[in-house]
Amino acid sequence: MAHKKVIVLVAGGTGGHLFPAEAVAVELRQRGYDVHLVTDRRAKCFVSCVDEEHTHIVSSATFTRRHPFALIKTCWILLKGMGQSLALFYKLRPVLVGGFGGYPTFPPLLVAALMRCVTFIHEQNAIMGRANRVLAVFVHAIAGGLLSQTGTHAHKTLLIGNPMREVVLKAAKIPYRPSLGEKPFHFLVFGGSQGASFFSRIVPEAIALLNNKIRRRLRIIQQVRGEVVELMKTYRSMGVQAEVAPFFNDMAERMAHAHFILSRAGASSVCEIAVIGRPALLIPYPYALDHDQAANAALLARVGGAQIVSEKDLTAQRLASLLTQACCAPHLLEKQALAAKKVGQPYATRRLADMAEALIAGRSLSDVREEFFDENAV
């Protein structure tokens, strides 16, 4: 009996990095590969599609500009991670190693390149992350989610889109139905892992400024950090129906049933909004490295699929005004939803798996580019 070919996927331990990697892992497993996931300890609460036997934790750390001793410690941890990766790859003998962003991808991808494995990285954002920027020099191909195909590595960059989990693709089949007349208006608010606390402050302030007629229609679903009880009390005192939680396991389904979304502009959020096709107000996280969230949001806003307001400009008064407009202009929201849907890339998972197989087969990048290039991917 022939052994299955091994593919190793590497991702940082947050949902934004892990979810695309998991989506591709499921697709490649269905194609007969033995897929392993390498990540860091933060991943335990996110990993669901890869079993414990196929999940490997490698030491990693983030470079900062702190004390020199901290820098030495970081270098030591990364070297330790390289040693762990070397031992793992000698055991698994992968035919392909792919990275999905975050500093934990650095040791395994660098080791894979030194071992002359076939390698690729996937960059979700419109602006390449710092770890990927270094790794781009060593890998055979770069798969872009929102990435521009210009610059130093344009010759090996393929714009494929961001892989979507099956739950997102299922949610994408639910058509957008505007809230007409006095019907309930579902308002979904989430801030990702960064900046949710800002929404916990600004949203109730804005709701307090709305007239009673609109407030009665609102059905708020809000993802928060640690303000659940306090926020629920605030909404109850205003007579607003709300559901508040630190995490929703069925977020894709909730997005599909939303009439309007308030969100940060991480690559995963932007692409899921596009694939599902929902109108959104995007507030880029102002402290994101290299302002990648602003660039992500601009791609969706450019086609009329979203509105953008900077955090410093989003006052309670402005949000209340935008919410009032949204509730009173259902057909405008429907138009925005259709615009977002047109640029969504629901087949990115399959196409990235196709690219991976093409690389394993030794096909040239020019052949792969011709088959997978799509300038409209979002």
Swiss-Prot record:
InterPro entries: GlcNAc_MurG, Glyco_trans_28_C, GlycoTrans_28_N. GO terms for molecular function: UDP-N-acetyl-D-glucosamine:N-acetylmuramoyl-L-alanyl-D-glutamyl-meso-2,6-diaminopimelyl-D-alanyl-D-alanine-diphosphoundecaprenol 4-beta-N-acetylglucosaminlytransferase activity; undecaprenyldiphospho-muramoylpentapeptide beta-N-acetylglucosaminyltransferase activity. Pfam families: Glyco_tran_28_C, Glyco_transf_28. It is found in: Cell inner membrane. GO terms for cellular component: plasma membrane. Keywords: Cell cycle, Cell division, Cell inner membrane, Cell membrane, Cell shape, Cell wall biogenesis/degradation, Glycosyltransferase, Membrane, Peptidoglycan synthesis, Transferase. One of its GO terms (biological process) is peptidoglycan biosynthetic process. UDP-N-acetyl-alpha-D-glucosamine binds at T14, G15, G16, N125, R165, S193, Q293. This is UDP-N-acetylglucosamine--N-acetylmuramyl-(pentapeptide) pyrophosphoryl-undecaprenol N-acetylglucosamine transferase. It comes from Bartonella quintana (strain Toulouse) (Rochalimaea quintana).
